[in-house]
């Protein structure tokens, strides 16, 4: 016989929170040397996004790989940013910096696809950007590339944002 709470449980299970997807970028084994030997842990880097202009990344460390991934996903959901888009691309060219890693992101014509490699491609895919060109300059470790890309995406402004800034600057001059 069915329990009265079964239907509620099923609906909660089927409904994902805002349809947020995650993709694993890297897993690193971390070793700490202690008096008794070596302590092994795992670090995971995950990118999360909803393919509708929201994307984030997170890192997690734990004794087991699945737990590290879970922690990284939770951290990524807390760190999501809104990415402005124009159709299927970004509004303008932008440079992202983090440490010695630099990422140049350029808008591309519709239908040209994502010309990017590794972590940048995953970020663009989960952000819902399907036409963009990128170039990685300097450090190319996955975490530096991710942080530089997120820095670049956070610098993007829409045409309306720029017009508001110009109007406010003009009113300050008067």
Swiss-Prot record:
SUPFAM superfamilies, per the entry: dsRNA-binding domain-like (SSF54768), Ribosomal protein S5 domain 2-like (SSF54211)
Record has Magnesium as a keyword: no
Keyword Transferase: no
PROSITE patterns tied to this protein: RIBOSOMAL_S5, S5_DSRBD
InterPro entries: Ribosomal_Su5_D2-typ_SF (IPR020568), Ribosomal_uS5 (IPR000851), Ribosomal_uS5_bac-type (IPR005712), Ribosomal_uS5_C (IPR005324), Ribosomal_uS5_N (IPR013810), Ribosomal_uS5_N_CS (IPR018192), Ribsml_uS5_D2-typ_fold_subgr (IPR014721)
Function: With S4 and S12 plays an important role in translational accuracy. Located at the back of the 30S subunit body where it stabilizes the conformation of the head with respect to the body.
Family classification: Belongs to the universal ribosomal protein uS5 family.
HAMAP family xref list: Ribosomal_uS5_B
Name of the protein in its database record: Small ribosomal subunit protein uS5
Organism taxonomic ancestry: Bacteria, Bacillati, Bacillota, Bacilli, Lactobacillales
